[in-house]
Structure formats: structure tokens, C-alpha cells
């Protein structure tokens, strides 16, 4: 047993993290399977997944096409509820865990691997039940209309972020024209969505979270901060768009819902942040709103790579995003309506 394994085991033990499955959960797993109920058949549409190279639970797939009016983006999300019955032992265990926990080289999943890495994972060339959010965008990247459907898809390819980034510079002739056209359309739509994000002054705080590499004995061999790629933003903006539509949908059809909210920062924390940047020589006198002030600080920090550690201080001044039945909007994203419809395998 190496040093890394020992360290993770210690963290699991000290925090009493549930990491084994009960007999009841294991018994239910034997009877699970993909149901063949009536669904929209979208298997011919070239959906693809785009994830990190080490990902095993593929819970979202995308397809995008451009037309004379703008863009049509379809986001397919694994339909976990089709497999996990309400109040079942698996459901109760997922509720207890709340989220998957990711350690280096180890994951403690919220759902058993048979579900998260197989039955609900959008593996290439496998039929999977999904919920699809189909969105029509204008040329400027504004959502014109949307609808949700219970569908079945068959992922045509599993991409990594680096592979999609490579495609932006080098067109892979081994890929079908449909897949290439979809990636190109999503790239163009993402540029519009990022432009809209900038116009509404959503916060753009780049993560300085390091990634660790480990040697054979479990010792740290390298520490580095991974580069954020445009391919990451393609998926992020696609998921944000789907989550906006999810919030609108539940509000329209149910009159209430569970929203992902982010409140404005507290006055005292903003004052402390102002003092810090004032000592750094930055003028802090002429801001009309907390949003303008924080964006100014972020812009200042991002001018120099050496300053980016200061992003941690900005993050600490913000409130934590949370779930609520009160729809008060998302300060960081500058959205009035926002929920979490995506990533049902891990949260």
C-alpha cells in the first residue's frame, strides 16, 4: 500500500465518509437495467461527450447545429431517475452521500459504479436513456425557445477537452462531417455566449487550484495549475444554458422549484477586500456597485500571472452558492433564473 492510498484511507476514516455499499443496495443492483419504454429516438443524431481524460462517468452529451436563424443546441443528460427508484435503498444512499468525492486516483461515488460508470454513463455506441434540453438560439446567442424530452441516444464519440482543443487548430479527417460540423457550430455559439456573459458582467475568476501528479510509491512528483481551455468553456456554457432552461421550466410548470442561488457579498467582506486592493495601489473610490468593484479587482489580478493567487481572496469575499426554493438569482453568473439539471450522476 503506497503513501497516497494510506493518506486517502486516513481522510476517509477520520471524516467517516461512507464508501461501502450495503447488502440492500447490492441486492437492488442485480435487478437494474435500461428500460425500453416509449421515448424520442435520437440515436441517429451525432451526440458526443467532452470530458477530462480520466473521466469515467459521462453524464452529459451535446449536439449543435447552425441554421439561418442561429443555432440549435441539444444537451442530453443521463436519466438517472429512470433507473433509480424513489425511496429505494440506492436512492436513500445517494441522498445520504449527497455527492461523489474525488481524490487523486480514487473516487467515492454517490451512486454505485454499475450505475455511474455503466448503466447511466453515456458511453460511446451504447443506447442510453436521457433527458434532452433542446434550445433554439438567435445569431446573437439569446435563447429563443426550448423544450425538454425523454429520449434515447447513442453517443457517437467520447472526446477529451484536449482533443476538442486540437480540433480547433487541426481538422481531423477521420471524424464524420456531422461531428465536425457540430463541434464547429458549438464553438461559434460559445463565442456568442461568452460575449453575452461579458456584457452582463458575470464574474470571471480563473481557478488557481493545483493538480498533483504522483509517482509509483504514491509520493507527489509534480504540482501544476492546468490551463483552462476553450473546450472547457464550450461545455460550461452549454450546461449553463440548459440549467437556465431547467429553472424556467420548473417555474412555468410547477410554480416552484429548487434553484441554484448565489447571494451578493456581505458589506464587511467587501470593505476588507477594498482595503487590501487599496494597499496594493488600486483606486477603490468610484465603484457604483459591488459587481463593478469585484470585476475591477478581477481585471487587475488577471493582468499578471503572479497576481492570480489573489483570486483566492476575491473568492473568500463571496458567499457560497447553494440550493434554495427561493429564486433570488445567481450573483456570480448574473442570472435571474438558474438551477442544476446537469450532473445527476455525481450530485
Model-identified regions with their sequence ranges:
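Electropositive polyanion-binding surfaces
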Residues: 1-347
Amino acid at each position: 500500500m503506497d503513501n497516497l492510498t494510506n493518506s486517502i484511507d486516513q481522510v476517509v476514516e477520520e471524516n467517516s465518509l461512507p464508501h461501502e455499499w450495503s447488502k440492500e443496495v447490492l441486492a437492488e443492483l442485480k435487478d437494474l437495467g435500461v428500460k425500453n419504454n416509449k421515448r424520442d429516438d435520437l440515436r441517429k443524431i451525432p451526440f458526443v461527450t467532452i470530458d477530462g481524460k480520466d473521466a469515467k462517468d459521462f453524464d452529459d452529451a451535446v449536439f449543435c447545429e447552425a441554421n439561418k436563424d442561429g443555432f440549435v443546441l441539444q444537451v442530453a443528460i443521463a436519466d438517472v431517475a429512470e433507473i433509480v427508484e424513489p425511496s429505494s435503498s440506492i436512492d436513500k444512499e445517494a441522498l445520504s452521500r449527497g455527492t461523489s468525492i474525488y481524490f487523486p486516483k480514487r473516487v467515492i461515488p454517490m451512486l454505485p459504479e454499475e450505475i455511474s460508470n455503466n448503466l447511466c454513463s453515456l458511453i460511446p455506441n451504447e443506447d442510453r436513456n436521457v433527458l434532452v434540453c433542446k434550445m433554439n438560439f438567435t445569431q446573437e446567442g439569446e435563447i429563443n425557445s426550448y423544450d425538454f424530452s425523454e429520449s434515447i441516444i447513442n453517443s457517437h464519440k467520447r472526446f477529451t477537452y484536449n482533443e476538442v482543443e486540437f480540433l480547433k487548430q487541426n481538422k481531423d479527417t477521420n471524424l464524420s462531417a456531422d461531428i465536425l460540423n457540430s463541434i464547429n457550430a458549438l464553438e461559434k455559439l460559445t463565442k456568442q455566449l461568452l460575449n453575452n456573459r461579458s456584457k452582463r458582467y458575470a464574474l470571471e475568476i480563473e481557478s488557481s487550484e493545483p493538480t498533483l501528479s504522483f509517482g509509483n510509491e504514491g509520493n507527489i512528483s509534480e504540482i501544476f495549475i492546468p490551463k483552462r481551455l476553450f473546450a472547457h468553456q464550450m461545455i460550461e456554457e452549454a450546461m449553463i444554458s440548459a440549467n437556465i432552461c431547467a429553472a424556467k421550466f420548473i417555474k412555468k410548470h410547477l410554480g416552484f422549484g429548487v434553484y441554484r442561488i448565489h447571494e451578493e457579498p456581505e458589506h464587511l467582506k467587501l470593505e476588507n477586500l477594498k482595503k487590501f486592493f487599496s494597499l496594493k495601489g488600486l483606486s477603490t473610490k468610484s465603484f457604483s456597485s459591488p459587481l463593478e468593484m469585484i470585476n475591477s479587482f478581477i481585471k487587475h489580478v488577471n493582468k499578471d500571472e503572479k497576481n492570480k493567487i489573489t483570486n483566492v481572496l476575491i473568492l473568500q469575499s463571496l458567499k457560497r452558492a447553494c440550493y434554495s426554493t427561493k429564486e433570488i438569482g445567481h450573483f456570480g453568473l448574473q442570472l435571474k433564473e438558474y438551477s442544476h439539471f446537469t450532473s445527476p450522476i455525481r450530485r
